[in-house]
Amino acid sequence: TTNLRVELAKDVTIGDKFFKKGTKIDTGIDVPKGAYAPLGMPVKFSEGKVKVGISCAVCHATVDRETKRVIEGAPNADLNTGLIMALATNSTAYLTHAQMEGFTQYIKDITRTVTTSDGKTEPLPDPEAIEKAVDETFLKWPPGNFDSTIDMKSNPSQIPDSFTLGDHPYGWSGFAMA
């Protein structure tokens, strides 16, 4: 399949959007014919747990809709990275890729504090409010796009291919090469 659909086990609110139990989520994750795991997502059993990783191929490979064969280097044009990350239990870990205009608006309780490196005490932002804001941002990303910049702005761009022929002076990462 070129779009692994996942059925929600329970009602959930992500950001400002409500998803009902039983809703089938379009992930855009590709699963090659005959494969036991999604493309670009190595699965292993370790320390008593199933662990799933992500490799470059999750974004930079796809399954051909007609032949059902893997096309390495082609972008996964419908991979829904924003929705997948918003559904994660701690999308705030990726807040540097969301639209964050500072943290003062998220400070709800001034008794929750941290001591800074210079010995001062500063209030901590509300983690649930930040999670909600990050999720709202990620839900706006169109499928086939990803934000790889760490600039506190939401500026996803289309997932590129990883072919380099004819791309000179740009490499697979998009940066100019000498």
Question: What residue spans do the PLM features occupy?
Answer:
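Periplasmic c-type cytochrome electron-transfer domains
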Residues: T1-A178
